[in-house]
Amino acid sequence: MKWIEIKIKTTEEACDAISYMLTSIGAGGVAIEDPNEIRRETQKSNSIDYVDDEFLNSLGEDVVVKAYFPGETNVPELVSLIKEKLAFIGTFLNVGEGYCGYAEMDEEDWSNSWKKYYKPLHLTDRLIVKPSWENYDNKDGEIIIEMNPGMAFGTGTHETTKMCAVLLDKYVKDGCRVIDVGCGTGILSIIASKLGAAEVTAVDIDEVAVKVAKENLELNKVDNVRVFKGVLDDIEKEKRDIVVANIIANVIMDISSRVPYYLKKDGLFIASGIIKERKQEVLDECLRKGFECVEIIEMGEWVAIVLRCLDSL
């Protein structure tokens, strides 16, 4: 199958919003190449691979977002739509250089090339995410999450996902009920299940993500997660203990008025995908919607907020 690869150079603060936009207009897959993230990862004391300074210096500063659309797509119409969407995102985020062109490629060329960069990774002291094609000798007490990301977002390497993993590790209790909004590959749903959640309901607007999530659930032998294409409003309004959303600031603020319909009193809303510059804006909006701030953590340029639901609706 042929694919159209769209290339966009942007900034770290705008890459998630752009990725979300590309998925919403029909991208079959989105890849983010963030040189700043690579530098941070390779400079950690527990980094798995050695990377020389010359390579790090060659990375540049731009974040590159690549999106893949079916080969029969009308490219001029697609490019026009993307430029229009980027202009809108540019009204509230610095999108950087923006659209940089497109190329045609075979599915095999892009669906497998990134695998050499995806290695086992510690999300927390006991949570390990590893690609399905890599071996890993787990130690006592470690929880292994196997992933085959395919064309969906969410491998565990991005700070926004890591922060969610850290917070789920802290707040998920045996028998609790969880909702995962914008589940991507299903990584957070799998983590919640393996940490003891009795049931997880996961949704994503992307059909590819739902397919990949279901495959990853099977890979991890997880049978208490229900995943389907949709948004928060498509989930039945039953009371849960935790709603986790690793999405973007605008969507978090948008759904914050409806999350209390899905949470018990004192239930937790874990919101990630927030760029630092918008932390206070998101926090203020959620406080106005009846939440209480429990905890805020930061990694790189990103923020995750834990909010307590004071008034279940």
From Swiss-Prot:
S-adenosyl-L-methionine binds at T161, G182, D204, N246. The keyword Manganese does not apply. It comes from the Bacteria. It catalyses: L-lysyl-[protein] + 3 S-adenosyl-L-methionine = N(6),N(6),N(6)-trimethyl-L-lysyl-[protein] + 3 S-adenosyl-L-homocysteine + 3 H(+). CDD domains: AdoMet_MTases (cd02440). GO terms for biological process: methylation. The keyword Iron-sulfur does not apply. GO terms for molecular function: protein-lysine N-methyltransferase activity. Keywords: Cytoplasm, Methyltransferase, S-adenosyl-L-methionine, Transferase. It is found in: Cytoplasm. Methylates ribosomal protein L11. Belongs to the methyltransferase superfamily. PrmA family. This is Ribosomal protein L11 methyltransferase. It comes from Acetivibrio thermocellus (strain ATCC 27405 / DSM 1237 / JCM 9322 / NBRC 103400 / NCIMB 10682 / NRRL B-4536 / VPI 7372) (Clostridium thermocellum).
